[in-house]
């Protein structure tokens, strides 16, 4: 584990001492929410100001939530201004983050607290927690938004949770060190990757039974379906490859590898994967290679390697797919990729060791 890098100082965007030059966002009429119960005292004024700021974001802007693994915090980024507007303290070692379908709640895997915290995205207060096993790491939400699936790294289980009642509705034993989670577009197949077993486990969400165990390369960390469900991609961090899996035949039909001049194979470690909605292009975070690979998802050829921050972990598109955001663990920042030009257009300082990122839906 690498030592902590110093946490950058972010502009203060609410309460006394707010830096309006850095944090001003154009107002949009009719969206400010009443938070009168917070109106008393300095804390109340700060929360009210921040909530009004978030609610006033233009219709074409989105909010990104970045988990800072060593900072024990969530940094909020406005994707219109491309600035961090707030950092909120949460549980210990936050990694996986997932938004509810309406964007009203953020679920946070606080691994060292053995819990999944629930953050109200309007008040920015922790309002409760979801049941989980020890050291929850990553989550996936069913397409209808009703079920949360969680990998618990230390007990080799996948937990299933009702997103509305916040109650556990099942669990499935999987391989050793479960991490990556994905759900098929029709909601029928859940995928978990187990880092030590080196497998992708395909689970029928109706019967809660494993229907296939697919061997992949060493240390699989992430899984993602294409939007049409025709392919499942699994990244293997130590193996240095992407396994392209036929989710119907349950076979690896192709592997994608990476070559970057001047870097050893060992330095190229695929982690996060994001597909465009049309399924034509994929982006893969390459960890300590400090690159994101843009891949033609039809030919499986790398189109371009984009230099981002240090130790890139996970990725998230803005809903309009104008930008792709990357969480860069060692450089403590988020890189912003313009998806049309395939260029990095900005680096945004966040908290200590950013790991996960998710963007609020429209």
Locate predicted features:
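Glycine-biased, low-complexity coil/linker segments
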Residues: 15-16, 30, 40-41
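Polybasic, lysine-rich low-complexity intrinsically disordered segments
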Residues: 3-4, 25
